């Protein structure tokens, strides 16, 4: 059993790489992982070999698993939705800047991805941006201007077209236009008090009270 953990921040203050055995993570390791997640926003685990059940067990250390409203899950594992690009498809599922399921009334606090087959070249990379840094770099006047703004998030936003192939294949029959939610665009992390921008170009359709130009 390996109960060691190392945490190495990535460049540009976006994310951290964590080396730990997630199959044998004790309370101390889990505490360190949660602290790193709140500090860096995104964390990466290398060289893991988890069964589906072990993956779900690890996920539940962070809270109840959310249901993805648009697509059917794995038959035996309702907590898991498969993200894939099939041969011949030109559109990448979920391609474009977004935060998952922000069009729901209670969006998940985190998203977990477990890579099984990843291309060695081309569009195999998932990119991440720090919304902590986005907020920090705003000047004081702009921070004040957006402090109480809210946005409308829609499942029928710009990124919805990337789901069409999967929905045709295994959609739940939900009308994306019916999934709308209003959220503040400045969020405060309840664990450390850090503020971040909560905007999703793939899902935001309108700023409340702000006229479109």
Report each predicted region and the residues it spans.
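Non-heme Fe(II) oxygenase catalytic core, chiefly the N-lobe of the double-stranded beta-helix
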Residues: 2-213
């Amino acid at each position: 059993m390996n109960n060691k953990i190392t945490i190495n921040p990535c460049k540009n203050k976006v994310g951290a790489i964590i080396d730990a055995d997630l199959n044998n993570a004790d309370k101390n390791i889990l505490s360190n992982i949660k602290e790193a997640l709140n500090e860096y926003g995104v964390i990466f685990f290398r060289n893991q070999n988890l069964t589906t059940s072990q993956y779900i067990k690890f996920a539940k250390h962070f809270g109840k698993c959310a249901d993805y409203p648009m697509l059917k899950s794995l038959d035996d594992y309702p907590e898991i939705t498969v993200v894939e690009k099939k041969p011949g498809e030109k559109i990448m599922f979920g391609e474009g800047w977004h935060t998952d399921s922000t069009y729901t009334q209670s969006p998940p606090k985190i998203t977990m991805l477990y890579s099984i087959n990843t291309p060695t070249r081309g569009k195999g990379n998932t990119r991440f941006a720090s919304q902590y840094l986005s907020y920090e770099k705003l000047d004081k006047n702009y921070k004040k201007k957006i402090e109480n703004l809210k946005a409308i998030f829609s499942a029928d936003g710009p990124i919805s077209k990337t789901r069409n192939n999967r929905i045709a294949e295994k959609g739940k029959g939900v009308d994306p236009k019916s999934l709308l939610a209003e959220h503040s665009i400045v969020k405060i992390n309840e664990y450390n008090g850090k503020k971040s921008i909560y905007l999703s170009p793939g899902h935001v359709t309108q700023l409340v009270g702000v006229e479109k130009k």
